[in-house]
Regions:
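Macrodomain-like recognition of ADP-ribose-binding/processing modules
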Residues: 1-133
Length: 133
């Protein structure tokens, strides 16, 4: 029942197909909108180090939106990955999961740096690693 409900909700918002967008370079697309409606190979999630999604109800972060509309299976897959790994996901690293109820095929989860006070060169390098991984 969850799957039918989530797919219907996403369809109501309208699916955006990558074939209707223009690449900024071969195979790379830059698009602004609701990432949970994008039909493509993979979307990127700004994840936390636990990798199991945001736990603040109705929080408007990308992590919560992706986990909520993908369905509970995504949290279960991320939990399984993290249990095998036995530690939090390091900043700048990435994991790939199935997308479940989202129109894309995969989700790339990457953990960005937490900038407390002042941006440092290490913060910049950690963020660059998110894109490289």
């Amino acid at each position: 029942m969850q799957d039918e409900y989530l797919k219907e909700e996403i369809n109501k918002k309208g699916i955006v197909d990558i074939n209707n967008l223009n690449p900024i370079q071969k195979g790379i697309y830059l698009w602004q909108g609701d990432i949970t409606t994008l039909r493509c190979d993979a979307i990127v999630n700004a994840a936390n180090s636990a990798m199991t999604g945001c736990y603040l109800p109705n929080h408007r972060c990308i992590d919560n939106a992706i986990h909520s509309f993908a369905g509970v299976e995504l949290r279960l897959e991320c939990d399984e990955i993290m249990n095998r790994q036995e530690h939090g996901e390091p900043t700048g690293q990435a994991k790939i999961t199935n997308a479940y109820n989202l129109p894309c095929k995969y989700i790339i989860h990457t953990v960005g740096p937490i900038i407390s006070y002042k941006l440092t060169s290490e913060d910049c390098e950690l963020l660059a690693n998110c894109y490289r991984s």
